[in-house]
Regions:
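Pre-Walker A (Motif I) flank of P-loop NTPase domains
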Residues: 2-5
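Hydrophobic anchor at the beta1->P-loop junction of P-loop NTPases
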Residues: 8
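P-loop (Walker A) phosphate-binding loop of NTP-binding proteins
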Residues: 11
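ATP-binding Walker
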Residues: 14
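Walker A/P-loop
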Residues: 17
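NTP-dependent small-molecule kinase module
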Residues: 22-26, 142-217
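ATP-dependent small-molecule kinase phosphotransfer cores
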Residues: 30-126, 200
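A glycine- and Lys/Arg-enriched "phosphate-lid" helix/loop adjacent to the NTP-binding pocket
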Residues: 102-172
């Protein structure tokens, strides 16, 4: 069986973690645990996770924007080689929490490094490996940040401490990417109830890969 590479993107507070948890659980019921690989960026193998610790450390406030972009790309390269390519070769369905689009939105747009410039850095890192499908969970910036303030329980990291304009830039970049690549990036209204969002995500996945969630459609 040919592997499938699906990435999940979203502005802060879009509910990506909750959606991914549900999608992963239901997909594992259908295909079996061994056929599904959940992974995240930055992260994956132990080298990428070590880079993640540097990137997310709330004390690293003096990190240069280009350093940040290059570290994300380095972690991604290791992730591609150590995790993603082997999983695809084994025929697995990959559910990846963030990928290249995050770098374009966060470092390219919000850090003002340039979307094309950050894309070029990442082209070198990924060596042509792009998701066949990207699920983008879209939510108005203010609503997303309100959700975080109300419901977040995990540790606040360095990237959670930006100003409102930063998060507006992230969202607008994602929307531009979705408009530019409609065949790959499917935009889901994340302002809806969690059950509705999950249903819409499943529909988008099934439309691309008819064998996924076939019993629900």
């Amino acid at each position: 069986m040919k592997g499938k590479f699906i990435s999940f993107e979203g502005s802060d507070g879009a509910g990506k973690t909750s959606v991914l948890r549900a999608i992963r659980a239901d997909l594992e019921k259908q295909l079996g645990d061994a056929a599904v690989m959940y992974t995240r960026e930055p992260g994956g193998d132990h080298i990428s996770e070590q880079i993640r610790q540097i990137l997310m450390d709330s004390e690293n406030t003096a990190m240069d924007a280009r350093t940040e972009a290059l570290l994300f790309a380095a972690a991604r390269r290791q992730h591609v080689v150590a995790d993603l390519k082997p999983a695809l070769a084994a025929g697995k369905v990959i559910l990846c929490d963030r990928y290249v689009d995050s770098s374009i939105a966060y470092q390219g747009a919000a850090r003002h490094l340039g979307e094309q410039e950050v894309w070029q850095i990442n082209q070198f890192a990924i060596d042509g490996l792009m998701p066949e499908l990207t699920i983008y969970l879209d939510i108005p910036t203010e609503l997303g940040l309100k959700r975080i303030a109300t419901h977040r329980t995990d540790e606040v990291n360095r990237l959670d401490k930006e100003q409102l304009d930063f998060y507006h830039a992230v969202r607008h970049s994602y929307l531009r990417l979705a408009e530019k690549e409609p065949a790959r990036i499917k935009t889901i209204n994340a302002s809806q109830s969690l059950d509705r969002v999950i249903a819409d995500v499943k529909a988008a996945m099934h439309a691309k890969f008819t064998d996924l969630f076939a019993n629900e459609f």
